Regions:
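Ligand-binding face of N-terminal immunoglobulin V-set domains in extracellular IgSF glycoproteins
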Residues: 1-27
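Active-site mouth of glycoside hydrolases
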Residues: 14, 27-167
Length: 167
C-alpha cells in the first residue's frame, strides 16, 4: 500500500478535470496496518499480528452532539472493545430522534421535529423544503468521520464502517 498515488477525476458535476497526488505512508508506531482475513477463519493485521475483534455497534455516535461523541470516546478508552461499528449516513430509529451534526450531501433535510417515540412507526412527512443534491457530497461530513476514525485509532480501536444500511 505504501507509495505515492495520483488521481484524476472527470465527472458531470465538475467544471473540468480534478487531479492530485497523495502519499500512503507506513503505519505509525503502534499501528499494525489494516485488518484482513488470515488462515480462512481468523483475522490479522497487515504485519501478521493476530486480531481478535471484540466490538460494539453505535450506529451514529459520530453524528451526535460533540458532548456525546466525547463521552463515547471516554467510555471506549476504558478498553472494553477494540472495534466499533457505525454508519456513514445518518439514521433515524427508535433510539435516535436527534438531527445529525452533518449530512453526507449538500441540501436541506426534512423537518422531523414532530417525530416522537409514540408516532415513530406511523410518522410520515412530505416536506417540500427537503432539497438534497445527491450529486454533491458534503466534504465536511466525511472529514469529520475521518477525524473520528483517527480518534478511535489513537485508542487502538478499529472502525467497522457501515456504508449501506438496508435495514
Amino acid at each position: 500500500f505504501e507509495m505515492p498515488y495520483h488521481f484524476e477525476i472527470e465527472a458531470s458535476f465538475l467544471d473540468g478535470k480534478e487531479e492530485g497526488d497523495f502519499p500512503v505512508t507506513p503505519p505509525l508506531e503502534g499501528n499494525h496496518g489494516p485488518v484482513h482475513v488470515a488462515y480462512t477463519y481468523h483475522f490479522a493485521y497487515e504485519d501478521g499480528t493476530p486480531y481478535y475483534p471484540v466490538g460494539t455497534t453505535c450506529y451514529v455516535w459520530e453524528l451526535q452532539s460533540e458532548e456525546l461523541q466525547e463521552e463515547t470516546l471516554r467510555e471506549l478508552a476504558k478498553g472494553y472493545f477494540n472495534k466499533i461499528r457505525f454508519c456513514v449516513f445518518p439514521k433515524h430509529y427508535i433510539y435516535n430522534f436527534h438531527e445529525p451534526i452533518s449530512y453526507p450531501y449538500e441540501g436541506t433535510p426534512c423537518d422531523t421535529s414532530e417525530m416522537t417515540e409514540k408516532n415513530f412507526g406511523e410518522y410520515k412527512t412530505v416536506d417540500h423544503g427537503n432539497h438534497w443534491d445527491f450529486y454533491r457530497f458534503n466534504p465536511k461530513h466525511f472529514q469529520h468521520i475521518e477525524d473520528c476514525i483517527q480518534k478511535l485509532a489513537a485508542l487502538g480501536i478499529e472502525a467497522d464502517i457501515i456504508v449501506m444500511h438496508p435495514y
